[in-house]
């Protein structure tokens, strides 16, 4: 990444930040002024390591991880004060997950403003991973702007409100393995057995791992995921949806 950010790139970043529609006077003012250090931080948040090995989004992504968890905790405390600690942890895990970050990144069309090197540009397997990572870095940069969580919550709370309603109406969508285990226990069945096979060696490949779920020795569902955990979760969701469709659930 060049030390001097050209005018075209500055305008691109400003247009993107305005498109987020963050309802904050402070944010609007700082963007309007085109503060150099702020633009630099957001440019860094939108630069992949394949373009610049030193100044890229990795540090802001690490920072954004902690910021995101705190902002989500704030949201849950305000919106669902009656929730137990366990329920809060389960919900938060979903609204800060890699899958959720990728979905948000696609919603805000972050990919169009991410600077990538030639290697990453041609790597379709890492596309979703980069979108999620850059979105998390964007959140880190937003916090860094003001050294405050306020703007992060002003941006994300409305999104979380919609998503949490959907998740809470169908708990299996965010806690599929636990829901499946409870269902098996309620039917006096053996607990589900998860069989994982690595079918690809590519990092970020959404089909890197395959998972079969067996109940009483019979294969009931299969799914893929970029990690063991995601493959198991996806297979459990598919199986519960199958049970709902057939009236078993």
Regions flagged by a language model, labelled:
Residues 1-249:
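Double-stranded RNA-binding/processing signature
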């Amino acid at each position: 990444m060049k030390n001097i950010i050209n005018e075209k790139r500055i305008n691109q970043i400003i247009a993107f930040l305005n498109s987020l529609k963050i309802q904050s006077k402070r944010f609007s003012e700082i963007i309007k002024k085109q503060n150099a250090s702020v633009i630099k931080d957001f440019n860094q948040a939108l630069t992949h390591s394949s373009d610049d090995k030193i100044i890229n989004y990795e540090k802001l992504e690490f920072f954004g991880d902690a910021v995101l968890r705190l902002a989500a905790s704030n949201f849950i405390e305000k919106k669902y004060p009656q929730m137990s600690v366990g329920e809060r942890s389960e919900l938060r895990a979903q609204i800060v997950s890699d899958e959720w970050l990728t979905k948000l990144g696609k919603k805000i069309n972050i990919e169009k403003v991410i600077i990538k090197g030639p290697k990453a540009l041609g790597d379709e397997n890492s596309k979703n991973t980069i979108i999620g990572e850059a979105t998390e870095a964007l959140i880190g940069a937003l916090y860094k702007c003001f050294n405050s969580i306020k703007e992060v919550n002003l941006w994300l709370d409305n999104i979380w409100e919609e998503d949490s309603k959907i998740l809470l109406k169908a708990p299996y969508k965010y806690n599929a393995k636990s829901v499946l285990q409870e269902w098996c226990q309620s039917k006096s069945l053996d607990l589900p057995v998860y069989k994982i096979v690595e079918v690809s060696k590519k990092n970020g490949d959404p089909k890197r791992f395959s998972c079969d779920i067996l109940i009483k020795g019979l294969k009931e569902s299969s799914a893929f995921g970029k990690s063991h955990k995601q493959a198991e979760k996806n297979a459990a969701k598919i199986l519960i949806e199958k049970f709902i469709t057939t009236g078993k659930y």
